[in-house]
Amino acid sequence: MHISIAAVGKLKEKYLIAGVQEYTKRLSAYAKIEIIEVADEKTPERASELEEEQIKQREGERLLAKIPHDAHVIALAIEGKMKSSEQFAARLDELATYGKSKVVFVIGGSLGLSKQVMARADEALSFSKMTFPHQLMRLILLEQIYRAFRINRGEPYHK
């Protein structure tokens, strides 16, 4: 399975970079992992709704340009479906079973994902009704993917 995480913005915090590197290394035993970063847009302090939509659209165009046409796309969005770790593991296993060898998780910038990205997504996933920093979301997602592989293989880790 080839799993990509397409995200807006570069990681800046050393602890996040170290965490992403650690889970990417751990996951290499289970799948090919790729992190795709696209440039984020500066959001003016008092941006209008129109300006925010235009920013999301520009970031979305960059994301869409990096997504293979044959990939199964999972958008991380607050309005997505929430799953337990076990349900998430079962979903990844199901995708692999049905030949979805390319899975792309998409993480938007601070304003979220554009309508175009959401339209391209095959499904939307939410980790919580709470809002998380988009940079931290990468690390949380990688940990849950790692946990899912461990669950699916019956390996110790998940408690």
Curated annotation (Swiss-Prot):
Enzyme category, top tier: transferase
Binding positions (S-adenosyl-L-methionine): L76, G108, F127, S128, K129, M130, T131, F132
Keyword check for Endoplasmic reticulum: no
Keyword check for rRNA processing: yes
Origin superkingdom: Bacteria
Catalytic activity: pseudouridine(1915) in 23S rRNA + S-adenosyl-L-methionine = N(3)-methylpseudouridine(1915) in 23S rRNA + S-adenosyl-L-homocysteine + H(+)
Primary subcellular site in the record, as a coarse category: cytoplasm
Keywords attached to this entry: Cytoplasm, Methyltransferase, rRNA processing, S-adenosyl-L-methionine, Transferase
Subcellular location: Cytoplasm
NCBIfam families membership: PRK00103.1-3, tRNA_RlmH_YbeA
Subunit organization: Homodimer.
The protein's role, per its UniProt record: Specifically methylates the pseudouridine at position 1915 (m3Psi1915) in 23S rRNA.
Name this polypeptide is given: Ribosomal RNA large subunit methyltransferase H
Organism for this UniProt entry: Geobacillus thermodenitrificans (strain NG80-2)
